[in-house]
Amino acid sequence: MSSSTWTPDALLSEARPSLGEDWRPVGARHRVSTLPIVDSLAEQEPLEDILEKTKPSVPLECRRLDYLLSTPFRYGAAYPAGSRFRRAGKILGVFYAAETPDTAVAEMVFNRFLFCAESPDTPWPDGTTEYKDADAWADLIDHSACQHLADRAREAAIEIIRYQSIRDPGGEASLAALTCRAFAEAGPV
């Protein structure tokens, strides 16, 4: 199907339940970012409380979730560049995860690489795929096809998009939770 035929009804006809555990590596930024500027854990706690009060509130439907799961949904401010399933501008957040630990690590490594890289002329490997829209969905820079798909999925009330990781050499699946209602558990397991 071409991207123009991915209507909410067409997407809904392809929707399937999530099949189990999903993976997302997390850092301990809440510990390492503020701990160096205080002398003890006792001093860090009030500092973290102050920082928490400056952040946007967690949406009502996400308040049952641990902060590691709800954080992507609390920031509704203008998002500068967009991501695979989130347009630039003011739009609902997306929680990205993977079906296997290896894929989760591959996604994390790639994102860390992007954060550190300052070589826009670096050539990227080419890949082929059997699906007509997969090339557009796998573009490393232009996420408009995925954002269009996410828009249609939201219209169809689809909560999770399962997609092939372009960063995992094995091509395993990754997941994009479009709403915090997609979580079966309130905290990470």
Question: Language-model features: where?
Answer:
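Short active-site loop/helix that positions an aromatic residue
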Residues: 105-116
